[in-house]
């Protein structure tokens, strides 16, 4: 049996340099290779004309450049494109491309499903199968960039921002998320500014501390409730890492980070008559008073079987005005791609659930309804 080839998309620059050294080659060859892969979108070693023929033969024998394939895509009326990405064994994750006048953002998945059980999120209802590998994470960026079109003459890439806000909790897959983000930031990789790469978390505090020690990228935090009682229901990881502990981790991250410019983005999904009252707005403002932040209010995006509804524009407006009375910066997120189920909280993919989440959910639906009313 032939030896399995090394997928070079699984290696950041440090890993590639180590591989080239082990092959008896100069480490700078790794830099050349990365430029071909990430600047020009080349996956065929024989097209890399500044790499000598002997080294190309070695690479062909031992290595490969393989990104997961796009199974299908849907385009929204607003230009948003949702991609189904095949990660093997009949499973798919979803990746969303959001073009705007001054930027093009890609929302990337980190897991097949999600191990957390946020009750308003479609991904969470599908259960969890496994973590994505480095090549499956960075491969989403590479594959979509290839679909939209690398400008091979200049090395210009069609993606300016990446947000780790797709399927999964990124901080539960740090082993692979950190090297993937390293490649996004690397000058020989996708060469994105650290302020243009954002990782989102629901509050896995020990992993947040580890991330802060390893990497400096923008941070978005999923709060969604102004107190522990409600957050225990909406974001059950709160039972393990309650709000005060989470806020402490956020403040420690901000203290280490330059990418956040001294403040963090707070994500708060607006659920009709659940977390959107003016009293809850006052409570949220007081909760966040010692944490430098801007607050992103996200109108809830319904999905089939969801127990929640979207807050009305008038309730969102009142909630926003209360927060601004406290001097907080507030943004109401514009919904993108909801007509193709590509908006925040709607990603589902195709998952072989290892947690039996769907069966358990059916038993719990009525209990959740009683708890939140």
Curated annotation (Swiss-Prot):
Cofactor note: Binds 1 [4Fe-4S] cluster. The cluster is coordinated with 3 cysteines and an exchangeable S-adenosyl-L-methionine.
Described purpose of this protein according to its UniProt entry: Specifically methylates position 2 of adenine 2503 in 23S rRNA and position 2 of adenine 37 in tRNAs. m2A2503 modification seems to play a crucial role in the proofreading step occurring at the peptidyl transferase center and thus would serve to optimize ribosomal fidelity.
One GO process term, biological-process aspect: rRNA base methylation
Main location: cytoplasm
GO cellular component terms listed in the entry, alphabetical order: cytoplasm
Sequence similarity: Belongs to the radical SAM superfamily. RlmN family.
Name of the protein: Dual-specificity RNA methyltransferase RlmN
Binding site for S-adenosyl-L-methionine: 168-169, 200, 222-224, 301
InterPro entries with a match to the protein in the record: Aldolase_TIM, Methyltransferase_A, RlmN_N, RNA_MTrfase_RlmN, rRNA_lsu_MTrfase_RlmN/Cfr, rSAM
Gene Ontology MF term list: 4 iron, 4 sulfur cluster binding; metal ion binding; rRNA (adenine(2503)-C2-)-methyltransferase activity; rRNA binding; tRNA (adenine(37)-C2)-methyltransferase activity; tRNA binding
Active site: 94, 344
């Amino acid at each position: 049996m032939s030896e399995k080839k090394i997928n070079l998309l699984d290696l950041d620059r440090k890993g590639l340099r180590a591989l080239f050294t082990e092959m008896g080659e100069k480490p700078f060859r790794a830099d050349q290779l990365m430029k071909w892969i990430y600047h020009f979108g080349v996956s065929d070693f024989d097209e890399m004309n500044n790499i000598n023929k002997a080294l190309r033969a070695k690479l062909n024998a031992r290595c490969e450049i393989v990104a997961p394939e796009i199974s299908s895509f849907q385009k929204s009326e607003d230009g948003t494109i949702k991609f189904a990405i095949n990660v093997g064994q009949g499973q798919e994750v979803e990746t969303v491309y959001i073009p705007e006048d001054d930027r093009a953002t890609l929302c990337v998945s980190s897991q097949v499903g999600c191990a957390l059980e946020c009750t308003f999120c479609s991904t969470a209802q599908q259960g969890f199968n496994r973590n994505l590998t480095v090549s499956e994470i960075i491969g989403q960026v590479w594959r979509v960039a290839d679909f939209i079109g690398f400008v091979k003459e200049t090395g210009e890439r069609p993606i300016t921002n990446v947000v780790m806000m797709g399927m999964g909790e990124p901080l539960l897959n740090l082993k692979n998320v950190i090297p993937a983000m390293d490649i996004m930031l690397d000058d020989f990789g996708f060469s994105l500014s650290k302020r243009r790469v954002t990782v989102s978390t629901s509050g896995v505090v020990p992993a947040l501390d580890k991330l802060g020690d390893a990497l400096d990228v923008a941070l978005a935090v999923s709060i969604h409730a102004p107190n522990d009682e409600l957050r225990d229901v909406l974001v059950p990881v709160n039972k393990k890492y309650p709000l005060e502990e989470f806020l402490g981790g956020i403040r420690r991250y901000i203290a280490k980070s330059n990418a956040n410019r001294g403040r963090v983005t707070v994500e708060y999904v607006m659920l009709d008559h659940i977390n959107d009252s003016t009293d809850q707005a006052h409570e949220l403002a007081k909760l966040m008073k010692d944490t430098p932040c801007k607050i992103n209010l996200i109108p809830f995006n319904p999905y089939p079987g969801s127990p929640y509804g979207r807050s009305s524009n008038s309730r969102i407006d009142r909630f926003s005005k209360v927060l601004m009375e406290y001097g907080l910066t507030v943004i109401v997120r514009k919904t993108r791609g909801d007509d193709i189920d590509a908006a925040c909280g709607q990603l589902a993919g195709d998952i072989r659930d290892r947690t039996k989440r769907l069966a358990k959910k059916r038993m719990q639906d009525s209990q959740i309804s009683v708890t939140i009313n």
